[in-house]
């Protein structure tokens, strides 16, 4: 049970946050309510076109980031919170497929929210975000593995 709270609960909480973000709460209309005043505060002369570009970019970056974090949490849970003794590449693929499937269902869910639309582009951004998150995880895992190998080779050998 301790393993569940440490590894799987963060995954479930993050899924809940993604699901909540797929509702009207984080629709473009809602996010513009705080972003536009903030951008106008930063630059009172900012044009509406520039605001629209920044708003669009931040929303897409949000998709990328939320799925990078989701995939990283999922990979961590699969790697540490299960009894799977699979290769890292298999865990990578499982985490990526799970994130991709959730991205599809997330966009499907948005098709039922009046202020949202399902977007294949957003789904692809989500899937790319998951891939980026997993690549970062693999880089850290490889770095950690090479450090442990270096420490083992530096240990003095016992003389017989």
Residue map of PLM features:
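Membrane-helix interface segments
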Residues: 3-7, 84-93, 119-120
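Alpha-helical membrane-protein architecture signal
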Residues: 50, 54, 94-97, 101, ...
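Short, low-complexity, charge-dense intrinsically disordered segments
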Residues: 152-158
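Interfacial helix-loop-helix junctions of multi-pass membrane proteins
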Residues: 103-127
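"…centered on the first transmembrane helix and the immediately adjacent amphipathic helix/loop
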Residues: 1-75
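Small-polar-interrupted transmembrane alpha-helices in polytopic inner-membrane proteins
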Residues: 13-18, 91-110
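Membrane-interface capping segments at transmembrane-helix boundaries
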Residues: 139-152
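Membrane-interfacial alpha-helical segments at the cytosolic side of multi-pass membrane proteins
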Residues: 67-82, 128-142
């Amino acid at each position: 049970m301790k393993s569940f709270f440490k590894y799987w609960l963060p995954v479930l909480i993050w899924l809940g946050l993604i699901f909540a973000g797929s509702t009207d709460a984080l629709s473009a209309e809602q996010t513009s309510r705080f972003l536009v005043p903030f951008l106008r505060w930063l630059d009172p002369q900012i044009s509406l076109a520039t605001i629209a570009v920044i708003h669009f970019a931040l929303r897409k970056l949000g998709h990328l980031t939320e799925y990078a974090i989701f995939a990283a949490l999922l990979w961590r849970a699969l790697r540490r919170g299960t009894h799977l003794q699979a290769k890292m590449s298999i865990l990578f693929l499982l985490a990526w497929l799970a994130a991709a499937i959730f991205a599809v269902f997330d966009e499907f869910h948005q098709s039922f929210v009046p202020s949202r639309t399902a977007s294949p582009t957003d789904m692809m951004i989500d899937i790319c975000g998951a891939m980026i998150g997993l690549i970062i995880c693999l880089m850290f895992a490889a770095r950690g593995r090479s450090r442990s190998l270096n420490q083992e080779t530096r240990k003095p050998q016992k003389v017989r």
